[in-house]
Amino acid sequence: MPPDNELMNELKKELGLVQGVILLTTSLLGTGVFALPELAALAAGDISLWAWPLLIILIFPIAIVFAVLGRHFPHAGGVAHFVGMAFGPRLQRVISWLFLSVIPVSFPAALHIAVGFGQALFGWQSEQLLFGELGTLGLLWFMGSRGASSSANLQAIIAGLIIALIAAILWKGAIKPADITFPAANEITFSRLCTALAIMFWGFVGIEAFTHLSSEFKNPERDFPSALIIGLMLAGSIYWTCTAVVLHFGVYSDKIAATASLPLVIVHLFGIQALWVACIIGYLTCFASLNVYAQSFARLIWTQMQYQPDHYLAQLSPGRLPLHALNVILACCCVSSLVVYALKINLNALIVYANGIFIMLYLLCMLAGCRLLKGRCYALAVTGCLLCLLLLAMLGWKSLYAGCIMAVFTEAKTHGVRRIRWPDSASRDLSDQHLYL
């Protein structure tokens, strides 16, 4: 059995710093940049102007731990690999399944947001929206077959369009810093702040998926941490700016679709003809996020099948891409989208339940950091654990969904599941693996 490093070398190493920043930024903005500003404004009003900086502060220690782990242990398995190094192969496979379990809730939510722009442009309803979602899955397959570098090049264009659009809104709307009013401390309601944070966390879902691409950086030790931190700060700044715009123009209401606020502002400033531009950019940002996630899920499945090298899902395409795994992922997405359509499940519910799983994954990665890291990074990992617990508490009873999924997979891996032979390196002694940073 080839060692892990040889397995990872089968994937193309074609990403640099700029491409990494672009991939993460567009992934984080993706489905949220048009929807979350209005959802945050609805949940907390002006308080959301404080909520975004607070969320960035909460996420920052977590992001640094992800960056350090991805720098020193680059692997297409991402979080599951880190957890496996810290706690052994059984929990590694549990985490892999936990990450994959987010597909039934996160992908339909993201696809629904994406094709919502078709509704704004063409008045799509019901079956038309469903066909739009299925067509988007076809485009995801096409991009997945082109590799990470091609995705980064496309997403560089998307990132440029997003920044240009926001700059145009600020310029045409003549919005100045003095026009943005932060609420006083005594006006902040803790319950509304927690509600906003629980929804807004969706904007920073993507960090864990980004770690699956760490092994495809040309120089992961140098470029991966920088790409992660720069991308995080850039995405957070754009989210805050968009929320300030939505609040400034007052375009948030229960009667307005989640993705309609910024397009309404654009139509108000530039005329109805600009709606095309807004909707195309909105769709592309959602597509960018979906693209990163689809490729991340495929790489996770591929790494988990490496200990059955003859398996269909363990094979790479001639272009050294895990296309078989990608096919399975997109087929699952197709089925889950059909189920959500048939049952008419609410978008907000999908987002919050998905957030619970992602926060659980972040918590487990922080626990792995506590085991693998020493020094200042150990302290950050402990802080990250506490922050993840706080975020789970903010979700309230809805966080039980993630807990139940975790319990089911843990029980399944303990009883009744055929054991797979793992190499000795997967459960090696970690006494010499701690990093003093």
Feature locations, PLM:
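A generic transmembrane alpha-helix motif of multi-pass inner-membrane proteins
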Residues: 367-437
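Transmembrane helix-loop junctions in multi-pass membrane proteins
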Residues: 33-37, 114, 143-149, 273-274, ...
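Juxtamembrane helix-boundary/capping and inter-helix hinge elements in multi-pass membrane proteins
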Residues: 42-46, 74-76, 85-91, 215-223, ...
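Hydrophobic transmembrane alpha-helices that form the core helical bundles
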Residues: 39-43, 61-137, 141-145, 159, ...
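Helix-loop-helix junctions that connect adjacent transmembrane segments
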Residues: 7-11, 49, 54, 123-135, ...
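TM-loop-TM module centered on a large, flexible mid-protein loop between adjacent transmembrane helices
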Residues: 79-88, 120, 124, 229-291, ...
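Membrane-interface "cap" regions at the ends of multi-pass membrane proteins
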Residues: 1-38, 42-47, 59-60, 64, ...
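Membrane-interface loop-to-helix entry segments
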Residues: 115, 127-176, 187-190, 228-233, ...
